[in-house]
A protein has these predicted regions:
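Terminal C-lobe "cap" of eukaryotic-type protein kinase domains
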Residues: 50-71
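Inter-domain helical "communication" segments and dimerization helices
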Residues: 28-29
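Conserved C-terminal C-lobe helix
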Residues: 32-47
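Conserved end of the kinase activation segment
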Residues: 1-7
């Protein structure tokens, strides 16, 4: 298996968001929050590690930006 690193933590945070706000499903129809927050979480769980946010800090900043723009 792959080493546990920052991108693994990003994935885990995204998966946790889907557990809390999507009933463990990743489809938009199950997501309880805004499209903006959905896209932040969906990016975090991308199978292509290079497409995920590069760090938990970057994930948090994207999440906060989505909240600040009234997309929650």
């Amino acid at each position: 298996g792959a080493a546990i690193d920052e991108l693994t933590n990003v994935y885990t945070a995204g998966a946790f968001a889907f557990a809390l706000f999507g009933g463990y499903r990743r489809g938009r129809e199950s997501w309880e929050l805004s499209d903006g927050l959905y896209h932040v979480a969906f990016r975090a769980v991308n199978a292509d590690r290079a497409r995920r946010q590069p760090s938990l800090r970057a994930l948090r900043e994207e999440w906060e930006t989505a909240l600040a723009h009234g997309t929650a």
